[in-house]
Every structure is written in C-alpha cells, then in structure tokens.
Amino acid sequence: MKVLKYIEFVNENLEVKGYRLPTYDQAIKMCSDEDSPFYEIKTEVDGYNVSFFNYRLAQYKDFVNYNGYEMRGLTFVFNTDGSVFNRYLLLEKFFNLNQVPESMYSIVKNYKIKYVNNKEDGSIASFVKFPNGKVLGKSKMSFESDQAIGIDRVYKTNSDIKKLVDWTLDNDIVAIFEYVAPQNRIVLRYSKEELILLRLRDNKTGKHIDLKDHLDKIGSVKIAPFEDEYNDLDHLIEVVAKQEDKEGVIVQTEDVNGRDFFFKLKTPWYVALHGLLTDDIYKENIIIGYILDDKIDDILGQIPETEVEAHDRIEKIIKII
C-alpha cells in the first residue's frame, strides 16, 4: 500500500515532457522508504550545501516502483538561505538489450534507431555551477574523488572543454562526459587523460539535445564516436558480436510514443575479459571483491532478470557485507 501511494504521488508530480525529473522533496521521499535502495549524500562547497542522490544495488523493480530512473548522480545545489539554486541531471538509468522487460528485443526491435555511439570505458563526468559562479567538475557522487579531481583538472587546462562547459551551464544544459585516463583504467587502455563528450541534456526538461546541432559549440572536443548508420537492429547485433577491443555501443532509439529510449549492447569480447558471465560470479570471494570495488551494479546488469537463482545468491552476499 505504501509503495502504491508513492507511485500515485510520483505519477502526479514528476513527469516533465515525458521525463520523470524529481524535485528535491520528491528525491527525499524516494529515499525514505525502509526498503528503498536510494540514498542521499550531503557535502558543502564554499558555504553552499550540496546533495547527491544515488542507489545501492537497485533492481529493475525498484526503478519501476519508485520511478527512480533519474536518481543516479542527481545533484542539488542550495543557496545559503536553504532554497534550491539548481538541480543537475546526469544520465537516466538504462539497461542492456534483453536485460529487463522494457529492453527486450521483442520490444525495441520496433523502435527507430536514431544514433549508435561507442560505449567508452571510463567514469561518468559532469559539472556543477554554484551561486557564486564557481564551476566544479564531479564524478557521479563526489567533488573529491580521484576521478573528480582529474575531471576538474581537464576543465582547468583544456580551453575547449572549459568553453563548452561554460556555455552549457550558462544555458542550463548538462554536458555529460566520460573521464578516461591511464590511471583510471577499467578494462580498455587509454593513452591520455581526457573528457569524451557523451550527451547534452536540457537540464529543465531532461530532453536529449542532438550533438550534431551544436558542433559549432563543441568545436574540437572529442565526442564518443558515432558508428556507421544502422537502421536494422539485427545487423547491428551481428556487427557488435564480432567486435574486439571495445566495450560496446549505446543505442539511442525513438519509442512508439516518440520519446528517446536508450539501451546498451556490449561486445562478447569485453564481457569475457571483464569476467561478467563466467562461473566466477558464483564464487563468494569474487562477488565480495566486486562489492568492495563498487562494481557489483555492473555485474548485476549483465545477469538477466530471469536468472533468479544468480540474483538471489548475490543479494544474500550483499546483505551479509
């Protein structure tokens, strides 16, 4: 009953032009249920309070029941009087092909493919502007992590990045990057520290802005490469299945209601190298390592919802940890 009432509340209050964008009060409500995977972390910068939101080990049902698709790295900056200065979006949660009901092949095969981009293998990055005009780079949940420090360093030393970021913040657009560096290796190697532009989002409506409409502003900033034109999902699946030395692709489609819908296609090469679908995921020491390294969400994302036994086993270990 509590969840049903919450869903009614969300449906009445969150939807903005097709995107469910939480206000601060609504984000707090998502965290208040005792079974909620969502949580808030608070910090302070130059006397301004900041709240980050995220989720711990959320399953598909949590995103559906709470409408929590926007809670990953959602950030609020407050004025000194306690009022909200601005809310900063990140990327909404999306899934792998065939991972959850909404990303099943039988559903998305009928969607129009708009763009296919290379999936970079680093850490998500964005920027926040404070009431005093200060701009800081951030990782998903921090201004102080090694990744956040690197993100801010690129902003301060790369004039093209700074120019683009400043323009987006002045126009209430969120520029979302992938931070890659030799010292930030996940699986793939990157030879230098840089920010690769992934997306531009309207910070008020959540709408994804076509990068190709703003190439003059993007300038020489590196963009996650656009793949060849793909109109046929079957062909794209065949191509990705044969690729090596890359993580995969992000597919941006248009659903039957005209709304942007994203899903991921990972290469078998990357999955095998990352050990995501090997027997290792059933070994307690391996699972504990993923939990401690904050990689378990990626692991869970590779296990289909139908693999109930695997999910249950991992969840039991998570609760112990």
Language model: regions and residue ranges:
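Core nucleotide-handling region used for phosphoryl-transfer chemistry
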Residues: 7-321
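A signal for long, low-complexity, Ser/Thr/Asn-enriched, surface-exposed stalk/shaft
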Residues: 1-4
